[in-house]
Amino acid sequence: MTTKRKPYVRPMTSTWWKKLPFYRFYMLREGTAVPTVWFSIELIFGLFALKHGAESWMGFVGFLQNPVVVILNLITLAAALLHTKTWFELAPKAANIIVKDEKMGPEPIIKGLWVVTAVVTVVILYVALFW
């Protein structure tokens, strides 16, 4: 059965998300995926360079020392930290932790996640630099 009624379609501009700060920040947070793709491609390129020997690896290291690549990697680091911060702030909302009949606030969970991140980072750096 078909109808001749034309449904109302609310007009929506392509810049609807720019009107509220919440949506602007949401788009920024979702945009952190783009630098992550860059870093993933860079890692794969590095793995292939490592596979093809010392000369290829030295070429990759030279590529990493390019100022443009350093800036892109710093942008990627900032995007990853922003994404991590927002993810850690979301985690307490998803977990309902009760201690002594009281719901735990978000601060200990967020701080705990940052501590775990710092410890894992230090361990990885230690293994990479001194092992």
UniProtKB/Swiss-Prot annotation:
GO terms for MF: succinate dehydrogenase activity
UniProt keyword annotation of Amino-acid biosynthesis present: no
Subcellular location: Cell inner membrane
InterPro entries: Fumarate_red_C, SQR/QFR_C/D
Regions annotated as coiled coil: none
Principal subcellular localization: membrane
The keyword Cell membrane is annotated on this UniProt entry: yes
Entry's Gene Ontology cellular component terms: fumarate reductase complex; plasma membrane
Family named by the database record: Belongs to the FrdC family.
Function: Two distinct, membrane-bound, FAD-containing enzymes are responsible for the catalysis of fumarate and succinate interconversion; fumarate reductase is used in anaerobic growth, and succinate dehydrogenase is used in aerobic growth. Anchors the catalytic components of the fumarate reductase complex to the cell inner membrane, binds quinones.
Quaternary structure (record): Part of an enzyme complex containing four subunits: a flavoprotein (FrdA), an iron-sulfur protein (FrdB), and two hydrophobic anchor proteins (FrdC and FrdD).
UniProt-recorded name of the protein: Fumarate reductase subunit C
Source taxonomy: Bacteria, Pseudomonadati, Pseudomonadota, Gammaproteobacteria, Enterobacterales
Gene: frdC
